[in-house]
């Protein structure tokens, strides 16, 4: 095959085929992409490895368009979370209700009274946007909000216990994720760790014996992401508060996930509520906004008015504060808690957590035939009972009864690993990536969080073509 001549960049830029790309991506991006493309084709064209049709304006514009689309595609993508873990940290945790999404849109589009008191016409406090709701729902005297619960714990410790000792049970020196360890956070906050008791048993006398002139606070951490069972003992919040107050010290309680309602009402495991911690005497309570609360990422610090005032004056508060979008979403979510009778209908996270297993199984029965057809004869598709998790460190032992589509390759065991990896990759490569979990030589798709059946079904033909 003889060599062919490449069209010039200028000719391609002025071609009708490239006009839509110019309009969508701009001249500079299109020019750079065309230059790169022609540079790659120059050597093959010189050696006759390309046909004339491959260098037509339409074909080259099409290839440039594919590259530009890939370059400009958003890195933030919607996915189907079919892992069985509802509050999946890697997949975004809590899904916001419609009310919060509308509030975010409003706050993003228009000016708003973020730090402006409409009554007085003077500068306001952004925490006031949710302070009234928090007081109403929890009975807390005051509140401040930062960007996550790790920040809440850090700020509270630094404000109340810097250069002093923080007394905490050895069994509560938890690690969450790969970088949040209570001893490390205390050190960063300038608080000297004074651990008492043992891993499995801590008594009131341990705290009493530890208190001295260097003591700054007592701390209690809810061990939400693991469970110690058997021969155990711990000091209840009310008793710990009495010990702290008897020595003029504050009690800081970190609830981690945190909830404002008794989850057993919806058949979920018991989790300590913010109201209970405050009623039992905790002076400061911290918890997350994007876990069991079902809101945006945030760290809420509630409690004693004087102590919250000290926390708000800490220079770190400005570095850790939340923006208008977070506050708008948080206010909307908190507002839903005013009507607990309809909370499971309106709060997306609670609705998904409390979804009946029978309803999920019926959905699996509907979807199994279509998925089986897309996968072909090389796969067995079975509807099975499944056990999901709340996630994000909440109730690690508890399981949520669910149903899943279990996808198992009809191949010898030694070949199943590759087949499963190929299927996982194909599912992740769909327009709406599907994320499941591997277990027992099969890929499980837990349907607890599958809200959009039509979108899931619409891309099954694409899956079949990817696997063929």
Curated annotation (Swiss-Prot):
One of its GO terms (biological process) is conversion of seryl-tRNAsec to selenocys-tRNAsec. InterPro entries: PyrdxlP-dep_Trfase, PyrdxlP-dep_Trfase_major, SelA-like, SelA_trans, SelA_trans_N_dom. The modification N6-(pyridoxal phosphate)lysine is found at residue 291. It catalyses: L-seryl-tRNA(Sec) + selenophosphate + H(+) = L-selenocysteinyl-tRNA(Sec) + phosphate. It is found in: Cytoplasm. It comes from the Bacteria. One of its GO terms (molecular function) is L-seryl-tRNA(Sec) selenium transferase activity. GO terms for cellular component: cytoplasm. Pfam families: Se-cys_synth_N, SelA. Pathway: Aminoacyl-tRNA biosynthesis; selenocysteinyl-tRNA(Sec) biosynthesis; selenocysteinyl-tRNA(Sec) from L-seryl-tRNA(Sec) (bacterial route): step 1/1. Its cofactor is pyridoxal 5'-phosphate. Its EC number is 2.9.1.1. Keywords: Cytoplasm, Protein biosynthesis, Pyridoxal phosphate, Selenium, Transferase. It is an enzyme of class 2 (transferase). Its main location: cytoplasm. Belongs to the SelA family. Converts seryl-tRNA(Sec) to selenocysteinyl-tRNA(Sec) required for selenoprotein biosynthesis. NCBIfam families: selA. This is L-seryl-tRNA(Sec) selenium transferase. It comes from Pseudomonas aeruginosa (strain UCBPP-PA14). The lineage of its organism: Bacteria, Pseudomonadati, Pseudomonadota, Gammaproteobacteria, Pseudomonadales.
